[in-house]
Amino acid sequence: AFKYLRETWDNGQLALRLGSHPRQVVTTTPRPLALLKEIVKDPSTHVTRGTTYDNLVNLAPNFRAQILARYANTTRGQQEIMGELLDDLPGALWHRSSIVYREAAELRRVCVAIDPAVTSSEDADETGILVCGVDVKGLGAVLGDYSLRGTPDQWGRKAVWAYHQHKANLIVAEANNGGEMITHVIRTVDPNVPVKLVHATVGKHTRAEPVAALYEQGKMYHVRPFPDLEDQLCTWLPDDPESPDRLDACIWGFSELMLGSQFSVFV
């Protein structure tokens, strides 16, 4: 459900239309996601908490010994063992407090950054499509999030639309998953759009750290809340095997605009 968290929640609300006092029970390890915080803050929500210690009698002895020894009295243990909803996830590179909102200043350069999904099936990742800008003061701005789950033709058309809508200078796309295909998709929609392919030659942690540092240094802002992007930024851990689409697009976009991306080629 975490992959489709807001969709799952929204659909669940539609099932509560009958009866005099419909209610629902939501149980989860409280990851610091925007939607979970919204639910907790809702005045109609009654919050109860349980801890791993409440359930020790039902857990395997070796599990109890290993998990409690490893996580007891740690910040990760506050979430995983004590069931606390933390403001920030321990070990995450991004923090909620570093994300600020303001109107965009005059922009010096704009790009549409794409992290293409490998497949377009129902359970596939979305294709991350972010519009990134750097203003005349040298600050980075997230201008739009047009990420979607769809076919190459669908995300190609959306990316080109965003390029024209925001008067971008170029489209930047990760080429590790089919560089020639990406170029073909975009050029089929509009042959005049400049495309820059970028290749991941180092690990994501190494690529992500400089962009996360821009946020910590107050050199970044969002023109409005982007809940899905912000959840990915603030819950991704460097050892996480998953590859969040919006986060990747964010890294590629601002590496291009503010950090001088390497290992890339114009086509």
Labelled PLM ranges:
Residues 1-2, 117:
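Conserved Walker B
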Residues 3-71:
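ASCE P-loop NTPase helicase motor core
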Residues 10-11, 17-24, 82, 87, ...:
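Catalytic phosphate/metal-binding cores of nucleic-acid and nucleotide-processing enzymes, i.e., regions
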Residues 56-117:
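ATPase catalytic-site recognition across NTP-hydrolyzing enzymes
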Residues 111, 128-239:
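Mg2+-dependent endonuclease catalytic cores in nucleic-acid-processing enzymes, primarily RNase H-like
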Residues 114-127:
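An active-site-proximal beta-strand-loop segment
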Residues 245-248:
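Conserved RecA-like P-loop NTPase helicase motor core
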Residues 253-267:
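Acidic two-metal-ion nuclease catalytic site recognized across multiple nuclease folds
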